[in-house]
Amino acid sequence: MTSGATDFRSDRVGTALAGTNPTVLRRLRAGFAVIGDVQHLPGYCVLITDTPGADQLTDLPPERQLLFLEDMAILGRAVAAVCARRDPGLRRINLEIQGNTDAFLHAHVTPRYDWEPPEIVGWPAALHHWTGLMTGGEPPLLGPDHDELRRELGDEIDRQLAAVS
């Protein structure tokens, strides 16, 4: 993706705060909307915290917890709007806070589609790229062919933010 890919992947929160994380779409109120650097399902995004050291939602003060959850909903609406325009097979948006692999607060915002193979539909989307079932191998990495998607997502996030301001 970029020559600094290793750097941003090793500290996604720090690089977002420093303005050097290339996956950041927009700064939200309690975090950063980022496009997934692996696009196992088109439009996959993540909300990452803007609080260094916050490993889970309960690490934040209650008012920041609510802002993070509101930001997650904003990003979810933006992903839903963009993906529905781009693919009539959009079925739903999954919103998940897991954090079992990456030790920083983040929420997965994953579009789910009617065209997903039946053996995958009931699985958490994160398993798609681990198993290779969607592509028969490595999932598509974020690159220049995603520039238009990035632009659309950023514009829609702006619209969603304006609607709640």
What are these regions (language model features)?
Residues 1-165:
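HIT superfamily nucleotide-processing domains
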